Amino acid sequence: MPLKEDDCCLFAEEYDGPPLSYNIPCAVPINVEKIPVAAVVSPVCISDNMSFPVIQPILSVESKKFLIDSVSPTSVIANCGSNQLELVSDSITVSPTSVIEHTEEEEEEEGGDGEDCELSSSGELLLRSCSVKESLDLNESSSNPLVPDWESNESVLSMDYPSSRVTGDCVSETNGDGKKQPVVTFLGIASDDGFEEEESCSNLRRVRVVPVKKQPQTKGKKGSCYRCFKGSRFTEKEVCLVCDAKYCNSCVLRAMGSMPEGRKCVTCIGFPIDESKRGSLGKCSRMLKRLLNDLEVKQIMKTERFCEANQLPAEYVYVNGQPLYPEELVTLQTCSNPPKKLKPGDYWYDKVSGLWGKEGEKPYQIISPHLNVGGPISPEASNGNTQVFINGREITKVELRMLQLAGVQCAGNPHFWVNEDGSYQEEGQKNTKGYIWGKAGTKLLCAVLSLPVPSKSTANASGEQLYSANSRSILDHLEHRTLQKILLVGNSGSGTSTIFKQAKILYKDVPFLEDERENIKVIIQTNVYGYLGMLLEGRERFEEEALALRNTKQCVLENIPADEGDAKSNDKTVTMYSIGPRLKAFSDWLLKTMAAGNLGVIFPAASREYAPLVEELWRDAAIQATYKRRSELGLLPSVASYFLERAIDVLTPDYEPSDLDILYAEGVTSSSGLACLDFSFPQTASEENLDPSDHHDSLLRYQLIRVPSRGLGENCKWIDMFEDVGMVVFVVSMSDYDQVSEDGTNKMLLTKKLFESIITHPIFENMDFLLILNKYDLLEEKVERVPLARCEWFQDFNPVVSRHRGSNNGNPTLGQLAFHFMAVKFKRFYSSLTGKKLFVSSSKSLDPNSVDSSLKLAMEILKWSEERTNICMSEYSMYSTEPSSFSN
């Protein structure tokens, strides 16, 4: 209708024409109460040069299809077509100093992560938006801004709004797709120094971390081994704790190596374990018990339980809606009463009473109170609906039932304040009304209702933090996680066993326990009977040689045939190596027992019975004559003379081996298995006077691992287990240069071959090597009699020796020259194969000072290697990462 000047109203007429090809604009009524407004800034705070930042609206994807003009916030015209424009949520605040938060419900529904953006107009603004599937690209939206009509808001802006934040009531309203509108957060104008910006960024919520299972690198048919692809589902296998790979009996040691973090593949070392297998940590399988000895199994299981990589990741545990930091998890696990069977998940924790439970469930344990972990407890933490609160948490019906039966007055929906000792009072009052768990009947009631009661450790903690045995073990393991491992290897007879025992005596307060000494006593006494048997075998040989020599001389002197001479000399069969009938019978019986392999079964149990015969045998002149020629008995070891000279005392029932006896004893350490020793070097007098901060080196822990030579042979079955050792100590017996093995090969050449196989193995490529040339005292004695050129590798040893040799006049001895020659030989051989430097030390394994010096040299090498790595890292961080910044 045409508008007349005197009309005060407008009327619309009904359209009855042809159908329209476009959408008809609709008039949307305005709810004035829901129009977002902002308070007028005080004129005092406004300067002439100050301009306000402009909020750029974020539109949906559908709205990008239309070209939209600037629309006033109070406009009533909206497009009501199929692609309807959706206004930003009514809860948006347009004040430059306000904060518009994106609620947790919207984030969880959209499933997006927060993204920080920065807008700058005249002042700096921090914009945090939620990246949802249907959000508009920020760059595109900023290029087509929708500038709001600020003039149309003048009618509603007033000084009647004292607050700078006005929020509508439609936060939970959804859009046409049933999804909530994304809300933008403005964190205000940053200060000049940027402090507010940094503080706001640091307060952003942490992203929830979801455990992701690592997949195995290879996988065969179902039920087969993941390495050799053999076997079936019925074949016994060992399972990796990380990727679930399964290995058979033949492949488990090669696939898992030395297991520095337990039963993990070598490629899985450093990864967290599968949480479904946490219950099997430290529980050894039958397969490992068959493959390894008890000491190795115990060490692997201990490492598996307490190593840092296998501990529960802190970010997987949520307490009162917040993920834990590593320090908080350690605090939680090391308290006097920690949560039992802690697994990844959401938990609630009442810090006042110590009540602990899973999110949305009733409490199942009372842990130590007042722990600074997680956030504040939520009223809906246990999903209660009783209108009764304990320390700000609405309790469940089961808890309410327990309180009512315990005599607590719960009428009127009270709010209780409960302490760790069970005392309770209403909020706002000081009078204690009673103790919830004070009666024995209440504890029985809690047991029936499956509710927790305070433990004795919680009641007696008195604010002091105590440590459980398991938590203490975790801390101890984390404290010593920098354990330096030293691998001790050498050929058979090189002296690795003696060095290992010497280290045990030097660095352990109690090197051998009582039962160990009793077992060593049996070994020593059995060895002495074996040495006597070797002497008796040599006596028979010497006796036969003496008789043959006598007959030959007699036949030559009398000029008669040898056969007739033997017949005439039957009565003259007594030589200096002959023994009486009684000792002869004992000798024959002992040799038969040795040949049958029953020496360890009969002796030393029968020592008391045969002690008189042994004493008589040792004092016999024939045995003494044989003992003087002991160097001609190839099977008799050099340490035999130490025990044979004390045979009468050693074979007594009340014999107790000394530390020196144990050092000389053979067979004390296993020749077929690993032997480990954890130790630390004691502080010297000079170190005790140093500053306490300089004691770090002496307090470091080391692990000496002795490996048998047969395990490092051609197949090298043990080498793959030692990829985490710090260095390798290779021991060489210098007195073996003239010895030969059973197949006739020189022992020094066999040692060289073993040394080559180890230094060229890829496992030891980046490790330092210390060569200990052992038995220096035996070398000095032997080299005077047997030339070093007896070994074909040392045929070029031609020293210039002075007539007046000796250490007194400053000239090196022949033994010193031989040692230096061997050291140079091994150094050149090592350098030719690896291109690196070999550290060399001489040693007398029976001398404690000599062994101590060699092992301390190993410590210094490890220390220097660590410092060298730190220096390289510091240089790397100081200079640019460009290739031109480095020089070769």
UniProtKB/Swiss-Prot annotation:
**Which parts of the sequence are annotated with region: G4 motif?**
770-777
Signal peptide positions (record): none
List required co-factors.
Ca(2+)
Main localization (coarse): nucleus
Give a brief account of the tissues where this protein occurs: Ubiquitous. Strongly expressed in vascular tissues, root and shoot meristems and lateral root primordia.
Annotated residues that bind GTP are located at 490-498, 661-669, 774-777
Which Pfam families did the record assign? G-alpha
Q: Where is this region: G3 motif?
A: 702-711
Q: Where in the cell is it found?
A: Nucleus
Q: Where is this region: G2 motif?
A: 661-669
What name has this protein been given in UniProt? Extra-large guanine nucleotide-binding protein 1
**Which species is this UniProt entry from?**
Arabidopsis thaliana
Gene name of the record: XLG1
